[in-house]
Amino acid sequence: MQFRSRLFTMINSIVKSWFTKVSEFLVVMEVSKIMKTYQDINKETIDRWVEEGWEWGKPTSHDAYISAKNGEWKVFLTPTFPVPHEWLGDLKGKKILGLASGGGQQMPIFNALGADCTVLDYSSKQIENEFLVAEREGYNIKAIEGDMTKILPFENEIFDIVFHPVSNCYVEDVQHVFNEAYRVLKKNGILLAGLNNEINYIVDSEEREIIWRMPFNPLKDKASLEYMIKGNSGIQFSHNITEQIGGQLKAGFTLLDIYEDTNGSGRLHEMNIKTYIATKSAKLSK
């Protein structure tokens, strides 16, 4: 009996060791996918979301485009609260850059209001949607498939407005994004940005318990990496207010206005806990 007990213990130990090694191998395989750059993982993830009917990948309708031409319109930087019209002002003849703003949702509205629109997005599907709406409505759009974590492919001081909806949660270094937005804006140009605060990244998937230590960075923490992979969430990063608003100030912007918003669904939304910030900032003449 003693021999059998030892044999069972030994076999059990071997099996546990084997399963552990297999699990570690699978994690390594997933990490190796990410090592082709987190930006490319996010590109593939968002392309897949668009194909699955993602809310922020559905192009605006013809009726909404016509309504905008008649002065009735709304666009979003965050999930539920429309951008105040006075934040944008008269758009006739204005040059707008939609930064990580593809999908055919905001740029068609701005075109209908008379703006000269350029959009940069790393998602192929979001860029396809821009061309789809432009062809349907008969206007030209400069739509560029590009990565905002790199130097933007534009000269200095050429845009009047940079419209940047929630998206820098997919970027590890947000300071670079704000610096580039400042560079491509004209003097007195405006940056409109939708921003995550840290709250979405401290809670579990049910939004009931605080489980994550900040900052949330899957490139530096195995547990958060596995969480992102399991949730089909791409690679996301938390950014605090120092990074999000302080980063704009550090880039040279002057903060003009601000509002908050919720997720639009889920327990945090039901509790009216604000998880997003929208900012209006200016590149004032010095």
Locate predicted features.
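Core SAM-dependent methyltransferase catalytic element
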Residues: 251-253, 267-286
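Class I SAM-dependent methyltransferase SAM/SAH-binding core
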Residues: 94-151
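A short SAM/SAH-binding and catalytic strip from SAM-dependent methyltransferases
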Residues: 160-175
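Conserved alpha-helix/loop element of class I SAM-dependent methyltransferases that forms part
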Residues: 60-94
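A short acidic, Gly/Pro-enriched loop at the edge of an enzyme's catalytic core
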Residues: 149-162
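Conserved class I S-adenosyl-L-methionine
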Residues: 190-223
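Short alpha-helix
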Residues: 235-258
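A short glycine-rich, Lys/Arg-flanked "PGG" loop and its adjoining helix->strand segment in the class I
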Residues: 175-190
